[in-house]
Amino acid sequence: MFRTKRSALVRRLWRSRAPGGEDEEEGVGGGGGGGELRGEGATDGRAYGAGGGGAGRAGCCLGKAVRGAKGHHHPHPPTSGAGAAGGAEADLKALTHSVLKKLKERQLELLLQAVESRGGTRTACLLLPGRLDCRLGPGAPASAQPAQPPSSYSLPLLLCKVFRWPDLRHSSEVKRLCCCESYGKINPELVCCNPHHLSRLCELESPPPPYSRYPMDFLKPTAGCPDAVPSSAETGGTNYLAPGGLSDSQLLLEPGDRSHWCVVAYWEEKTRVGRLYCVQEPSLDIFYDLPQGNGFCLGQLNSDNKSQLVQKVRSKIGCGIQLTREVDGVWVYNRSSYPIFIKSATLDNPDSRTLLVHKVFPGFSIKAFDYEKAYSLQRPNDHEFMQQPWTGFTVQISFVKGWGQCYTRQFISSCPCWLEVIFNSR
């Protein structure tokens, strides 16, 4: 019997599904710590981002993540549940095949392209009926039935569960990317089911003191940089020089300049590499190596840093991050295969005198900056805010390696590869 192309595409898609219980590569789970955590052990090593993360919590510098109800990477999985797990796998396979076989050949090809590229290539939306729910269970084929979590899934949720996050349970755990046609639409007739047009939401958690909080100690600017402007707690000075003798701090505060909403600086340890990148479009990709990449390519910058650690981390940046300005603030989506670490004043408690470092796993999104919260942080009688009005408008992002009291790196200036994002407060 001749096998049709559609059947071959369905089998190929199923083989490309996300691993359910196998160990991920070291970088996905432990790239942030990598043997550099103080008192490291099971806390960081078992938190995997590509397939897990459970409730999607963004941990502090410890990188703690809550595993989902499915119990991925449990050190001692209960043997009594082996049969149930096998039955669930068979049910999921039957349901997935029944859904995929209803798709047209062109739709299957589009889905396969998105899955195999792992989001590295911009792929089109896969528009399918939005009111179809998929019932997961014995003798329950895909049909339009009332949602009964966790046994009933919408089509986008099912495909995300199969191809990205096996522990995914509810639509509230994911966020649609702004590049998607279904972004911002409520109950559309056709909804995009491309699993790489959605991201997993990070849920902030309160860290157990005293492990994740550290004082905001300022370092002095270097003597050779008279124009240095302290823009962050750790670097102590970022020497921004703009054409015409104006510092970038003055440029950011020019009332008539509204062409950009933020600028990005790339650092390798204590050295800034390349020029500032002004962002005008609502979305920006920051990457080292990205197929069909369009944005801020770190791989094209000339770096004289010969450190093996810097070169190793640089090679792991890969697809990097996506920075998007949306209605409720600025979001960061981790497109790479390794965790990123973020510090932002608007992610922390407004009453706190210290800031947290949040670990964001691959495939996860976090609202890294909130304009309303940032404005509320400005205190007119505070000398620091008077001298540096954009201090609360700065976000720091480190690739692969974390920093803070939990790590040997106390300051972000010790991280191999990191970004400083300064938002235009006007």
UniProtKB/Swiss-Prot annotation:
Entry-linked InterPro entries: Dwarfin, MAD_homology1_Dwarfin-type, MAD_homology_MH1, SMAD-like_dom_sf, SMAD_dom_Dwarfin-type, SMAD_FHA_dom_sf, SMAD_MH1_sf
Basic residues: bias regions: 67-76
Domain MH2 as annotated: residue spans: 261-426
Modified residues (Phosphoserine): 249
Keyword list, A-Z: Acetylation, Cytoplasm, Isopeptide bond, Metal-binding, Nucleus, Phosphoprotein, Transcription, Transcription regulation, Ubl conjugation, Zinc
Any one GO biological process: regulation of epithelial to mesenchymal transition
Cross-link (Glycyl lysine isopeptide (Lys-Gly) (interchain with G-Cter in ubiquitin)): 64, 70
GO molecular function: activin receptor binding; beta-catenin binding; collagen binding; I-SMAD binding; metal ion binding; transcription corepressor activity; transcription regulator inhibitor activity; type I transforming growth factor beta receptor binding
CDD domains: MH1_SMAD_7, MH2_SMAD_7
UniProt-annotated binding residues for Zn(2+): 125, 180, 192, 197
Disordered, as annotated region: 14-42, 67-87
Keyword field contains Transcription: yes
Modified residues (N6-acetyllysine): 64, 70
Tissues expressing the protein: Ubiquitous in various organs, with higher levels in brain and kidney.
Post-translational modification, as annotated: Phosphorylation on Ser-249 does not affect its stability, nuclear localization or inhibitory function in TGFB signaling; however it affects its ability to regulate transcription. Phosphorylated by PDPK1. Ubiquitinated by WWP1. Polyubiquitinated by RNF111, which is enhanced by AXIN1 and promotes proteasomal degradation. In response to TGF-beta, ubiquitinated by SMURF1; which promotes its degradation. Ubiquitinated by ARK2C, promoting proteasomal degradation, leading to enhance the BMP-Smad signaling.
Signal peptide start and end residues: none
SUPFAM superfamilies xrefs: SMAD MH1 domain (SSF56366), SMAD/FHA domain (SSF49879)
Subcellular location: Nucleus; Cytoplasm
Pfam families found in the cross-reference section: MH1, MH2
Gene3D superfamilies: 2.60.200.10, SMAD MH1 domain
Presence of keyword Metal-binding: yes
UniProt record similarity statement: Belongs to the dwarfin/SMAD family.
Role: Antagonist of signaling by TGF-beta (transforming growth factor) type 1 receptor superfamily members; has been shown to inhibit TGF-beta (Transforming growth factor) and activin signaling by associating with their receptors thus preventing SMAD2 access. Functions as an adapter to recruit SMURF2 to the TGF-beta receptor complex. Also acts by recruiting the PPP1R15A-PP1 complex to TGFBR1, which promotes its dephosphorylation. Positively regulates PDPK1 kinase activity by stimulating its dissociation from the 14-3-3 protein YWHAQ which acts as a negative regulator.
Name of the molecule in the record: Mothers against decapentaplegic homolog 7
Source species: Mus musculus
Taxonomic lineage of the native organism: Eukaryota, Metazoa, Chordata, Craniata, Vertebrata
